[in-house]
Regions:
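Bacterial Sec-dependent N-terminal signal peptides
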Residues: 1-25, 227
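Conserved HGGG/HGGXW glycine-rich cap/lid loop of the alpha/beta-hydrolase fold
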Residues: 33-80
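Active-site loop/oxyanion-hole signature of alpha/beta-hydrolase fold enzymes
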Residues: 69-107, 111, 276
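Short glycine-enriched nucleophile-adjacent loop
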Residues: 113-124, 130
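Flexible "cap/lid" loop of the alpha/beta hydrolase fold
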Residues: 121, 129-165
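Conserved alpha/beta-hydrolase catalytic His-Asp/Glu region
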Residues: 163-219
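Conserved loop-alpha-helix segment in the C-terminal half of the alpha/beta-hydrolase fold
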Residues: 227-270
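Catalytic histidine-centered segment of alpha/beta-hydrolase-like enzymes
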Residues: 267-279, 283
Length: 292
């Protein structure tokens, strides 16, 4: 699952390391563009996505917040890294970055939402509140409620094999088909497809494999800070909705049942990229979350 713009302000580009990269052989785990001033908001995009997915969000928040917009290594044209496991590397270096710049609101979409949860689990003193955009503690259990980290091993290995063996034409077609289930507007599909095709395929496979096989459903009980969760109500395949709004709400409640202080809101008509599919609902709901 996945997940080109320029603001008038010139962004500050920093790496996901505390040292000057020229003095450190380790490649940065991410780049960051910083906009505005105020309390920090850390914005993490999803799989194979650019930080540009937060363009509209930054425009609305930069007068009140200092927006730290990440693009993860290997995605949307950013140089990949060799450090593994990929997701644990991202979590550690994101935590180091937040620790260096001050606790704040951590907001993530898709894979970024998963990382936001994982950061709060590891050290919720870094997180004043979490805003999760269409992400779940255990992705595999959405389709297979009885799934465990062990039982999804075969599916994970099959996914890795299939994606690795595709040629570029097959991969583009597969990504376009997948994105069409996640975004309604063709122009936005093409934007996300461009990010995906600029991404390093090995990084996509490694990140997706880790996401499929990491279950945070029990661990989220450790989170004591407020967590606000937006979920897409339009989960479709071949143009047909798979779940009603009520069923989507139930799925989210089940996945997040061990999280004590939470608010779950369903964007009834939006697909996975909620900020693209229903921006009015997204920004209205986001403002409510920020004001609480």
């Amino acid at each position: 699952m996945l997940f080109l713009w320029m603001l008038i302000a010139i962004p500050l580009i920093v790496s996901g390391q505390t040292q000057d990269p020229s003095k450190n052989q380790k490649k940065p785990a991410f780049t960051v563009e910083v906009y505005g001033s105020g309390a920090p908001v850390y914005m993490i995009p999803g799989l194979a996505s650019s930080g540009d997915v937060w363009q509209g969000t930054v425009e609305r928040l930069k007068d009140r917040y200092e927006c730290h917009v990440f693009t993860l290594a290997g995605f949307a044209g950013k140089e990949p890294i060799s450090r593994t496991p990929y997701l644990k590397t991202m979590r550690k270096e994101l935590m180091d970055y937040i620790d260096a710049h001050g606790s704040g609101i951590v907001m993530g979409h898709s894979l970024g939402g998963f990382l936001s949860l994982w950061i709060a689990i590891a050290n919720d003193s870094l997180v004043e509140k979490s805003i999760i955009v269409d992400s779940y503690p255990f992705l595999a259990a959405l389709r297979q409620p009885g799934a465990t980290e062990e039982t999804v091993q075969f599916s994970r290995e099959r996914m890795i094999q299939q994606m690795t063996q595709m040629d570029s034409v097959q991969f583009r077609r597969q990504q376009k088909n997948t994105l069409s289930t996640m975004i309604s507007d063709e122009q936005n599909i093409q934007k996300a497809l461009k990010w995906s095709m600029m991404s390093d395929r090995a990084t996509i496979v490694n990140a997706m494999g880790g996401l499929m096989q990491t279950d945070l459903r029990d661990e989220i009980s450790k989170i004591q800070t407020p967590t606000y969760i937006m979920v897409a109500g339009n989960i479709s395949m071949n143009g047909q909705r798979l779940y009603s709004t009520k069923q989507v709400q139930q799925l989210a409640q089940e996945q997040y049942k061990n999280l004590s202080e939470k608010t779950i809101s369903v964007a009834e008509d939006a697909k996975h990229f909620i900020m693209m599919d229903d921006p009015q609902w997204f920004y209205q709901t986001l403002e409510q979350y920020l004001d609480e």
